[in-house]
Amino acid sequence: MSTISATVAGPSIVQFVQIDSLVVMKIVKHVDSEMYAGLNEVAGEACQGLLTGLVSIDDRRLEITNCFPTARAEPMLDGDEIAQNNAFYEEQKQAEMLDMLRKFRDMNIDYELVGFYQAHPFGACFAQETIDSLIDYQASVPDGVVLIYDPVKTRQGQLSIRAYRLSTKALEMSLDGDWSPESTRTAGLTYENMLEELPVVIKNSHLVNVMLAELALEGDCAIQRSSSHLELGTRRSLEKCLRSLMSDVDDLNRTVMAYTKYVADKQRYDLTVYNAMQKRQAENEQREARGEPPLSFDDIKKMKPPQLTTKCGMLESFLCSSDARAHSDYAAEACLRHFSFSSFCLCFFNENIAKLFLAEAVVDSHGSRDHGGAAASVR
């Protein structure tokens, strides 16, 4: 969890996010270059960078005017001192960030940090590291956001950039470090309202607006002729999405089992404490009747309550639920956009479906044969 112990600076006034087209192009270029180079598999972390801009108080708008990528961690080799290398990497990363902000200031570019961006396939960005980074930003900058870029949808022709921030209740609970089931229930916090999604508006220059208007006037024929050789590649991405969804369901099932065990242990603990309190109360009444001093309840109050065995309390189950919802939303959208249910089964599960129908036919044939043999024996 985040180690920040400061209080929230104040409620955010931002209601939507405005992104310059320059920022969009830099994010897309950065992510595509690293994904084609295979750096995600080597470094084992998301492609990310920092956002700079300003807050328009009158319009209640967060303007993101520029961005720059952050340095990646180099892979550890055998025999290296991990702690020393991590400290050196963090110092180098901090120095590069300050140097870039200094250059922005010298060039009269907005250099105020307003958040960060990350690239996550299918928009499944809900991880502990992302939450910790949001806590760090929003504890000092209440209007800070994270932009989540989906490279899979973008390659299929749909630019996907979404802006998130922690809700006020989620930020307060994160700063307190208390994600127990009782605290989340009292705060009314669920995986649906843990993060707030802000509307995103992309600001283009006048020349770009003119070009888009001309493209709109040309009609669909020219676009269809120029894109007839393109392929959406939905089949492969949907297969990866379903595999990730299966992993999310397994993780979610594990957290649900841990919560179920916690509920049973908590009920058993409450019953034990209640019985002990009632027994001590009756014993004290008898002692008072005999003129003896009553016994203390401190030993009963010191009984250790059960703890949720997940890593970060209810936060882990919230993250698993959000990831599963992101993957299921993408799968549902892809199926509705490109496939009927029958073609979806034929495209992705043709071998398994064929084996299933074959096994069913074999079972039916054996069943009918056994039934016929039994009837013949009766005759």
UniProtKB/Swiss-Prot annotation:
A GO term for molecular function: translation initiation factor activity
PROSITE patterns in UniProt: MPN (PS50249)
GO cellular component: eukaryotic 43S preinitiation complex; eukaryotic 48S preinitiation complex; eukaryotic translation initiation factor 3 complex
Keyword Disulfide bond: no
Subcellular location: Cytoplasm
Biological role stated in the UniProt entry: Component of the eukaryotic translation initiation factor 3 (eIF-3) complex, which is involved in protein synthesis of a specialized repertoire of mRNAs and, together with other initiation factors, stimulates binding of mRNA and methionyl-tRNAi to the 40S ribosome. The eIF-3 complex specifically targets and initiates translation of a subset of mRNAs involved in cell proliferation.
Family named by the database record: Belongs to the eIF-3 subunit H family.
Name the UniProt record assigns to this protein: Eukaryotic translation initiation factor 3 subunit H
Organism name: Brugia malayi
Lineage: Eukaryota, Metazoa, Ecdysozoa, Nematoda, Chromadorea
